[in-house]
A protein has these predicted regions:
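A charge-rich, low-complexity, intrinsically flexible signal that marks solvent-exposed coils, linkers
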Residues: 1-179
Length: 179
């Protein structure tokens, strides 16, 4: 069941008078009915990629230190972080030094996602299967919760074996399409 204040943790970590990040107060107006996803390249204290899936009025979010990979043999660590507001999917800018997440953010990829099973059940049970239809990422993917210990839940982002999969030796999407 979704929290009654799903963005409380997000808001607690930010001072919206000093950061250009969206506050989440303006609801997103979308008539397509599609669920959006985005991947943001975030040059913070360490470069990483923020993977976000729209669900229940927020963006469920994971920090992926090495970024997504099109090779099904490669599991990329994805650390679950606080939910973000829907309008964050379009955010690009510089978060000021001294603030949570300080650094430059660009939208690296965006598109629509389709859950292949019940997404709420998948998140609860620790295995979310979905399809992406984006500018750089497409096809079937999995988020699989691990037993790794950490302050936040640890998952793996894994590309499924399908027609969109590519060996990392032949094609590294992060190097071939860096921006």
């Amino acid at each position: 069941m979704p929290s009654s204040k799903p963005l409380a943790e997000y808001a607690r970590k930010r001072d919206f008078r000093q950061t250009p990040e969206p506050s989440g107060r303006k609801p997103r107006k979308d008539s397509t009915g599609l669920l959006r996803y985005c991947v943001q390249k975030h040059d913070a204290s360490r470069l990483h990629y923020d993977f976000r899936l729209e669900l229940d009025g927020t963006l469920k979010s994971w920090a992926v230190p090495k970024g997504p990979c099109l090779d099904p043999a490669v599991k990329r660590l994805a650390v679950q972080v606080e939910d973000h507001p829907l309008d964050y999917a379009d955010f690009e800018g510089s978060i000021p030094q001294g603030h949570y997440g300080a650094g430059d953010v660009i939208v690296w990829d965006r598109g629509a996602w389709t859950p292949l099973d019940d997404p709420r059940e998948g998140l609860e049970k620790g295995h979310l299967s979905f399809a992406l239809d984006g500018e750089k990422l497409s096809g079937r993917w999995h988020l699989i919760r691990t037993n790794l210990r950490g302050k936040q839940p640890q998952w793996f982002l894994v590309k499924a074996k399908d027609g969109e999969a590519r060996s990392l030796d032949c094609f590294d999407v992060l190097k071939e399409r860096p921006d």
